[in-house]
A protein has these predicted regions:
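Short, amphipathic alpha-helical "recognition" segments used to contact nucleic acids or chromatin
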Residues: 103-121
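Short, Lys/Arg-enriched anionic-surface-contact patches
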Residues: 86-109
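Short, solvent-exposed alpha-helical "recognition" segments
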Residues: 106, 138-148
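N-terminal interaction modules that seed assembly of large macromolecular complexes
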Residues: 1-26, 33
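General nucleic-acid-binding
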Residues: 27-82
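Short alpha-helical "recognition helix" segments of helix-turn-helix
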Residues: 81, 126-129
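Positively charged, low-complexity, intrinsically disordered RNA-binding extensions
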Residues: 86-89, 123, 130-131
Length: 148
């Protein structure tokens, strides 16, 4: 059993599942708890290392996107996230910095969108059509602004 579990948790399939940040499941497939940010970070870095030999650029883009998703899902800022995951790996730190920069850019775009919407005085659907946006994107930006 120990060998089987060891082989399973080192498999790419398992690591990719952990890197996705999905909930941990019990033996019946029912969600049990969230995966800890440090486990997600470790899985992302391990999958990145494995993929880097095939196509380094694609692997880096994948890892950056996963870190964006992981940091956003954790609800932590950069410093709190780094304190939680406690990594000294230069590659991981670089990817985390890139992800945090991307998250900051997304937040700035959302903030600008919300300000433009408020200034327009239009309904969500009218505003979205006026700027060629999806109304769901505008609603999401408004919802995120209200929870922040």
């Amino acid at each position: 059993l120990k060998q089987a579990l060891g082989q399973h948790v080192r498999s790419s399939r398992y690591l990719e599942a952990v890197a996705s940040g999905d909930m941990r499941c019990d033996l019946d497939g029912q969600p049990v708890e969230a995966v800890a940010p440090e486990h997600v970070q470790h899985a992302i870095v391990e999958v990145f290392r494995r993929r880097q030999g095939k196509d380094a650029e694609k692997a880096r883009a994948w890892a950056r996107a996963r870190f964006v998703q992981a940091i956003d899902a954790s609800g932590l800022d950069r410093d709190a996230y780094l304190e939680r995951v406690r990594t000294q790996d230069a590659t991981a730190l670089s990817l985390i910095d890139e992800a945090c920069a991307e998250l900051a850019g997304q937040a700035a775009r959302r903030e600008a969108l919300v300000r433009a919407f408020r200034a327009s005085g239009k309904a969500v659907e009218e505003f979205a059509e006026m700027y060629g946006l999806d109304a769901a994107l505008v609603r999401d930006a408004l919802a995120r602004e209200q929870t922040a």
